[in-house]
Swiss-Prot record:
Protein task: Possibly the antitoxin component of a type II toxin-antitoxin (TA) system.
Family: Belongs to the UPF0330 family.
Short name of any one Pfam family annotated for the protein: VAPB_antitox
Protein name stated in the entry: Putative antitoxin Saci_0468
Keywords: Toxin-antitoxin system
Organism: Sulfolobus acidocaldarius (strain ATCC 33909 / DSM 639 / JCM 8929 / NBRC 15157 / NCIMB 11770)
InterPro entries, A to Z: Put_antitoxin
Signal sequence annotation: none
HAMAP family tied to this protein: UPF0330
């Protein structure tokens, strides 16, 4: 059964640009599915949403980020900080 929702003009404009011939319901559903699939910080978010990184670059960025995070944890323990 259809439901009526209210959205701001700027959100409407953004959804209109995203829908590309699909219904608003299909577009919103796709966004929700995408969010649910990627809400835990998946590198594919950048690939799918923005297309700014290829698979190799995304993997390298994830690896570098992990190394940086590990180095901060190591320093904190080494200096006696918690």
């Amino acid at each position: 059964m259809p439901k009526v929702i209210t959205i701001s003009d700027d959100v409407y404009d953004k959804l209109s640009k995203l829908k590309k011939g699909r219904s608003f319901s299909e577009t919103i559903n796709e966004l929700i599915e995408f969010y649910n699939k990627n809400r835990k910080g998946n590198k594919d978010v950048l690939l799918q949403m923005f297309g700014i990184l290829n698979e190799e670059e995304a993997t390298e960025m994830a690896s570098e980020t992990l190394n940086i995070r590990k180095s901060f944890r190591f320093r904190a323990v080494e200096n006696g900080d918690t």
